[in-house]
Amino acid sequence: TGILKQMGSVPADARKSIGELVDSVKQEVEGAFADRLKALARAERDADLNAAPFDLTLPARAPAPPGHPHPISRVRDEIVDVLVSLGFAVHDGPEVEREENNFGKLGFPPDHPATDMQDSFWTTDGLLLRTHTSNIQIRAMTTHAPPMAFIAPGATYRRDDDATHSPMFHQIECFLVDEHVTMAHLRGVLAEFAERFFGSGTPVRLRPSYFPFVEPGAEVDVGCPFCRRADGTRAGCSVCKKTGWIEILGCGLIHPVVFESCGIDPEKWTGFAFGMGVERVAIVKYGIPDIRLLFENDPRFLAQG
């Protein structure tokens, strides 16, 4: 810098050559200074690393165990995959529903216990958290012209909380509307579902039951997968309560009143519907003793999947 300040006293004919020389020396000095600073920084970093209480040359720790789907999600997806492979399409709908779609159009009488404040979660007058995904059946039948075949997976809500019930649970509704649909078609779909989901040779039986939205109605049992002998018979166990059978869902032929409430002619169209609780099916498939285990998020339990 001092030399550059004295350039004014240098003769004009030598000023150019001396200026170039000064610039060259300046760049060389500044470069050497920068290199030295980098070397000092590296030396300081190396000293810190050598003094560290750990060896950076050691191999990295094993990666954390990979995540996996929750048992409820896995079972739901398995059920949906089976039913979609049988020709059903997925249909979605709201969890906050009007009373008429959740109860009225499904044939529930006004004094049915399910409509009580003690059994359902009401938000405001005429609105509640859906108690089943059958509300999607009403919405689909109101907005789609038959024939149709849908499944409706989703969360549902009821005032229930014990070892086998949860106030929030997941359900899958399956329904088909076409001409000349009979109980034989329903039983065929259920048998194929049980075969694919629970395993080859799983027997299915239907027991008469009552539901407001189907006629006739039935409860569906499958042969207990936990006590099956080599010859196909069941020995009876704690899961099936020594009966050899486990209830998994309710079903039936869609009631004519339901068709009429959706503007569909029951003289021309018929259909079936069935609904299952995903948690219930998961309990059956995996022998889970308490439904609350599915919601406690205990890593020891979830890792078993």
Where are these regions (language model features)?
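Amphipathic, non-membrane alpha-helical rod segments
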Residues: 1-9
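TRNA-recognition modules of translation machinery and tRNA-sensing kinases, especially anticodon-binding
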Residues: 6, 13-305
